[in-house]
């Protein structure tokens, strides 16, 4: 069934303290499948990034339901991506008074849902 891009609704979580590479491996698994299936997959995946992704997905579905009046059972994840956010600098003390810089990466998670078109 084709996806209706006119009814696309999105939700964004910004400055999540997680590497975008680690978030993308989970988003690749749920892109293009239904909302209910994605919740089940996220529930049982062993990755830490599933928690913020699940929150963003539920927020996108709530936006579709409350703002556009779309039935959640017809929703499919049309877009899901993670952009790189700013890296937080931290310093690790080293020998002889030196310090190494440590990057603490952040990411912005975007999930868009759209309803299926009836043929």
UniProtKB/Swiss-Prot annotation:
Family per similarity comment: Belongs to the universal ribosomal protein uL22 family.
UniProt xrefs under Pfam families: Ribosomal_L22 (PF00237)
Recorded superkingdom: Bacteria
Signal peptide (UniProt feature, chain positions): none
Gene Ontology MF terms in the entry: rRNA binding; structural constituent of ribosome
GO biological process, one term: translation
Cross-referenced HAMAP family: Ribosomal_uL22_B
Lineage: Bacteria, Bacillati, Cyanobacteriota, Cyanophyceae, Oscillatoriophycideae
Keywords: Ribonucleoprotein, Ribosomal protein, RNA-binding, rRNA-binding
Gene Ontology, cellular component aspect: cytosolic large ribosomal subunit
Official protein name in the record: Large ribosomal subunit protein uL22
Function: This protein binds specifically to 23S rRNA; its binding is stimulated by other ribosomal proteins, e.g. L4, L17, and L20. It is important during the early stages of 50S assembly. It makes multiple contacts with different domains of the 23S rRNA in the assembled 50S subunit and ribosome. The globular domain of the protein is located near the polypeptide exit tunnel on the outside of the subunit, while an extended beta-hairpin is found that lines the wall of the exit tunnel in the center of the 70S ribosome.
Assembly: Part of the 50S ribosomal subunit.
